[in-house]
């Protein structure tokens, strides 16, 4: 298989940090895009200092999110650094940033300024609340955006507080994925028209749009989604069940044919005739029967029942180490080895994209801070003496 160059020719300057922007540009880099990560050595990306670390004291999280990207360190408060960015934009014409609204403009490298240099520039700004509105300059984090989007309240159990998820839904499903889709849509538009684009990604907007089912039911029909009252939020037997030894299984056997298989496996055949659209009371009675049945056996005993031949939509709740060893994920090669600068290899989560006849491109793990300063500046025509002077002046942090 050839290396995947499906985005070969797409050149990106990534000014973002933490998770939403870097994960988007990681996706692009995996697909063959050329990404330069513009960083500061004074205000280091927190993912660089989040343990655990490898033998070189480099953070594994950062090495994953920033693989295959070049790293340069610029003091964006210096005019020389701004000139370097403007030079790069003539070639690297996709910008991704995650600052609060107005920061890049004040630095002199906002969309309008860069558009003057390169009219084809695609500029994607990822923020918590968007470029407009009363909250546009308000700081926030993943759980804040989910809270304001109306998603968390009906995702909890009755009389229980919302649960913090292990995966940052607003950051990734909201920020990363919508930024990636937006940039690719803008790139297609540019290919047809020659025009660049400003893309305003609000993570709150994006996760608000994820209220697709219950949000549509409320906006169209006035039905307010309630905790543990809906088919998919615990109001039916579509839920998680504890085993005798304290592990859990997920049950999604909603359709009649799957419910039949579930009832047979749990040895409650008398409940097979309960249909999908039964009353809430009947649903709860059935759920209680499922709950009691699961408590009768251990996790390992249920694994023998709900084995790879069972087709009734029941799966064990795996730990992450168990997921890494699951035969399905191993068959899909979802863990790969990626080279480090010292020639050794590091295991990482693979790109999930499977293209016919091609494979993802993993050049190297996330670079050390400023590792590519000289390489990038030499490509812009700077000589060794000029680069040395920029370092001494603090332009290269």
Listing of model-derived features with the role each one plays in the protein:
Residues 149, 175-196, 209, 213-220, ...:
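Oxidoreductase and adenylate-handling cofactor-binding alpha/beta cores
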Residues 35, 308-322, 383-388:
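Short, well-structured beta-strand/strand-turn elements
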Residues 237-310, 314:
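Aromatic-enriched alpha-helical interface/lid elements that frame and gate functional surfaces
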Residues 196-204, 305, 387-392:
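Beta-strand segments within the central parallel beta-sheet cores of soluble alpha/beta enzyme folds
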Residues 42, 129-130, 203-208, 245-247, ...:
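Glycine-rich beta-alpha junction loops
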Residues 1-182, 186-192, 368, 374-397:
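N-terminal helix-loop segment corresponding to the beta1-alpha1 unit
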Residues 163-174, 196-198, 227-232, 236-238, ...:
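A short glycine-threonine-serine/GTX helix/turn-capping micro-motif
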């Amino acid at each position: 298989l050839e290396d995947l160059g499906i985005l070969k020719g797409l050149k990106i300057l990534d000014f973002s940090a933490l998770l939403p922007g870097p994960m988007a540009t990681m996706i692009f880099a995996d697909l063959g895009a050329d990404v330069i990560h513009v960083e500061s050595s004074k205000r280091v990306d927190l993912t660089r200092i989040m343990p655990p670390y490898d033998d070189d004291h480099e953070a594994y999280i950062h090495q994953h999110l920033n693989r295959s990207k070049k790293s340069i360190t610029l003091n964006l408060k210096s005019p020389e650094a701004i000139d370097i960015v403007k030079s790069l934009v003539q070639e690297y014409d996709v910008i991704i940033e995650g600052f609060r609204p107005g920061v890049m403009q004040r630095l002199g490298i906002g969309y309008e300024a860069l558009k003057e240099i390169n009219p084809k520039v695609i500029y994607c700004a990822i923020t918590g609340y968007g470029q407009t509105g009363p909250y546009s300059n308000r700081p926030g984090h993943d759980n804040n955006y989910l809270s304001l989007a109306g998603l968390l309240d009906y995702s909890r159990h009755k009389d229980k507080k919302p649960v913090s998820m292990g995966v940052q839904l607003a950051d990734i499903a909201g920020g990363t994925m919508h930024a990636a889709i937006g940039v690719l849509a803008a790139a297609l538009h540019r290919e047809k028209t020659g025009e660049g684009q400003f893309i305003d990604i609000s993570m709150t907007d994006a996760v608000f749009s994820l209220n697709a089912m219950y949000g549509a039911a409320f906006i169209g029909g006035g039905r307010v989604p309630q905790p543990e009252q809906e088919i998919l939020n615990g109001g039916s037997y579509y839920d998680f069940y504890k085993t005798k030894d304290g592990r859990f299984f997920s049950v999604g056997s909603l359709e009649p044919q799957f419910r039949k298989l579930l009832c047979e496996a749990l040895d409650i055949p008398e409940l097979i005739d309960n249909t999908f659209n039964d009353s809430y009371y009947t649903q709860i009675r059935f759920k209680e029967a499922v709950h009691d049945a699961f408590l009768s056996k251990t996790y390992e005993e249920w694994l023998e029942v709900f084995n790879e031949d069972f087709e009734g939509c029941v799966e064990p709740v795996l730990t992450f180490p168990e997921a890494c060893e699951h035969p399905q994920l191993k068959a899909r090669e979802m863990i790969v080895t990626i080279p480090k600068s010292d020639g050794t290899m590091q295991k990482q989560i693979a790109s999930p994209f499977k293209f016919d006849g091609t494979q993802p491109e993993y050049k190297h793990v996330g670079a050390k801070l400023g590792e590519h300063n000289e390489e990038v500046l030499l490509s812009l025509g700077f000589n060794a003496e000029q680069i040395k002077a920029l370092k001494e002046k603090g332009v290269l942090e």
